Swiss-Prot record:
Cytoplasmic topological segments: 169-184, 247-249, 305-311, 399-419
GO CC annotation, single: endoplasmic reticulum membrane
Keywords for this protein: Endoplasmic reticulum, Glycoprotein, Membrane, Transmembrane, Transmembrane helix
Residues spanning the membrane: 148-168, 185-205, 226-246, 250-270, 284-304, 312-332, 378-398
The protein, known as: ADIPOR-like receptor IZH3
Described function: ADIPOR-like receptor involved in zinc metabolism either by altering membrane sterol content or by directly altering cellular zinc levels.
Length: 419
C-alpha cells in the first residue's frame, strides 16, 4: 500500500565490483561491460548530475536532447524532460517504457518517481496499457513482485464480503432484538468499508506498475482513501458499542468527531505530499491517531463503571489490535527484505552518493552466488514486508468484527455482566 517518490534512498544495490571499504561502507568504482568497454563510475555520474542541478537551479534549466532527438528542457534536479511541447515525463521514462514492453525491470531501471522499496530489486512492472495491468492480476506476463500483494487482499475482500452477506445476517447479535439498530448498522457498515478497503488496495497494487504517473498517483489516493474508511468505521463501531448504554450524547459526539477526522484524512490523502516516502511517519501517525480515538471510549467506560467493566475492551485488544500492531512493525521496518544477502547492498551516505541513487543503470545489481533460503533471494516475489502487512491487516479486520460481536454480547445479550 505507496507512489510518486522524492526521497533519497540511503541504501542501494551496486551493479559492479565493490571498492575497498571506507568507514564500513562500500563505494562504486569504474565498471566494464561484457565487451570490455569502460563505464563511468557512479561517483562521476553523480557529480555530473550535481553540476546539472547547480546549473538548472541557477539558470532556470538546461538544453538537452530528447529521446526523439529533438531539443527539450531539463527541469531542476528531479530531471523531468519536456519535448516539443509534449507532456512532461520523468527523466529516463522513455528508456524504462521501452524495456518494460518486453520484460519486468529491476529497481534501477525504473524512473526515480517509481522507486519505492529499495530492497525489492527484481520483478517490477512498467506497463504501457491498462489491459496489461489488469491481466497482470493473473500473471499473464509472468510472476511479479505485486502478485501476492494483489491476491492477499483479493482473498481478504472475499472473506469480508462473505461475512457481510452471509455470516453477519445469521449471527445472534444481528438477530437479537436487544441490540439497538445503530449498533447493527455500525457493524454492517464496518464490514462494507472493509470490503471497500481491500478492493481499493487491489486496484492500487494492480495499477502501480503502469508507466502513466498521473494514473498511478490517482490509484494510490484510492488506496489511502480505502484505509481511511476502514479505520473510521472501526472507531465508529467501538464507540457505538461501548458508549451507547452509558451516554448517548457522548457517543454521538465521538462518532461525529471520528467521521470528521476521517473526512479530513480522506481529503489529505489526495495531496501529493502525503504519498512521499518521507511522509511515511506522518501516514502512520494519522492512521494510528485516528484509531486511538476509539480507545477514548474505553476511558469513559472506566470513568463511569471503573474496572468492573474493563474486560469489555479486552476482545478488541487480543483479537484485533495486536494484529495491526505486528503489521505496522513490518510496514515501517521493511523486514525481512532489508536483511537479504543475495545482492550487494550499499550503505554509504553523502551528497555524491545521494545523487548516484537517482541514476538509471543498465546493469542489474551484482548477484552473489549465495542462493540459499536464508539469503532471502525470494523476498522480491514472496513474503516481503508489504505482503506481511496485508496479511496482518486482514487478520486485524476479521478480528475487529469478532471482537465487536463479543462486546455486543457482553453489553446486550449477557445481562448484568457488563454494567
Amino acid at each position: 500500500m505507496s507512489h510518486p517518490n522524492t526521497h533519497m534512498p540511503r541504501t542501494h544495490a551496486v551493479h559492479g565490483r565493490a571498492a575497498p571499504q571506507r568507514r564500513g561502507c562500500r563505494t562504486s568504482v569504474e565498471k566494464t561491460d561484457q565487451s570490455g568497454h569502460s563505464r563511468s563510475s557512479l561517483a562521476e555520474s553523480a557529480m555530473e548530475q550535481a553540476q546539472l542541478r547547480s546549473r538548472g537551479e541557477a539558470g532556470g534549466g538546461r538544453s538537452v536532447l530528447c529521446a526523439s532527438g529533438e531539443p527539450g528542457s531539463a527541469h531542476k534536479w528531479a530531471g523531468a524532460v519536456t519535448c516539443s511541447g509534449a507532456e512532461e515525463q520523468p527523466l529516463h521514462w522513455a528508456e524504462s517504457r521501452a524495456r518494460g514492453l518486453a520484460r519486468h525491470l529491476h529497481y534501477w531501471e525504473l524512473p526515480y518517481a517509481w522507486r519505492e522499496n529499495r530492497y525489492i530489486i527484481y520483478g517490477h512492472r512498467f506497463y504501457h496499457s491498462h489491459r496489461k495491468s489488469l491481466l497482470s492480476v493473473l500473471n499473464a506476463y509472468g510472476w511479479h513482485n505485486e502478485t501476492i500483494n494483489i491476491w492477499s487482499h483479493l482473498v481478504g475482500a472475499a472473506v469480508l464480503a462473505y461475512l457481510l452477506c452471509w455470516g453477519w445476517p445469521r449471527s445472534d447479535v444481528y438477530r437479537a432484538a436487544q441490540v439497538p439498530r445503530l449498533a447493527k448498522w455500525a457493524i454492517g457498515a464496518f464490514l462494507a468499508c472493509g470490503v471497500k478497503c481491500m478492493a481499493s488496495s487491489v486496484a492500487w497494487h494492480t495499477f502501480n506498475g503502469t508507466c502513466h504517473l498521473k494514473l498511478r498517483s490517482r490509484f494510490v489516493c484510492v488506496d489511502y482513501t480505502g484505509i481511511t474508511l476502514l479505520v473510521t468505521a472501526s472507531v465508529v463501531t467501538t464507540v457505538a458499542v461501548t458508549l451507547y448504554g452509558l451516554s448517548r450524547p457522548l457517543m454521538y459526539a465521538y462518532m461525529v468527531a471520528s467521521i470528521g477526522l476521517g473526512t479530513a484524512a480522506g481529503v489529505m490523502n489526495w495531496s501529493p505530499h502525503f504519498d512521499r516516502p518521507e511522509a511515511r511517519p506522518l501516514r502512520i501517525a494519522v492512521y494510528v491517531g485516528l484509531a486511538a480515538l476509539g480507545l477514548v471510549s474505553f476511558v469513559h467506560v472506566w470513568m463511569q463503571v471503573r474496572w468492573a467493566s474493563a474486560h469489555l475492551m479486552a476482545p478488541l485488544v487480543y483479537k484485533s489490535l495486536v494484529w495491526y500492531g505486528i503489521g505496522v512493525v513490518f510496514y515501517a521496518t521493511l523486514v525481512p527484505e532489508r536483511w537479504r544477502s543475495d545482492v550487494t547492498l550499499d550503505c554509504c551516505s553523502g551528497p555524491v552518493h545521494e545523487a548516484a541513487c537517482r541514476q538509471f543503470r543498465d546493469l542489474p545489481p551484482v548477484a552473489r552466488k549465495d542462493r540459499q533460503f536464508w539469503s532471502l533471494w525470494w523476498v522480491d516475489y514472496f513474503c516481503h514486508s508489504h505482503f506481511l502487512w496485508h496479511v496482518f491487516v486482514v487478520l486485524g479486520v476479521v478480528g475487529h468484527y469478532r471482537a465487536v460481536l463479543q462486546m455486543s454480547r457482553i453489553v446486550w445479550l449477557d445481562a448484568g455482566r457488563a454494567f
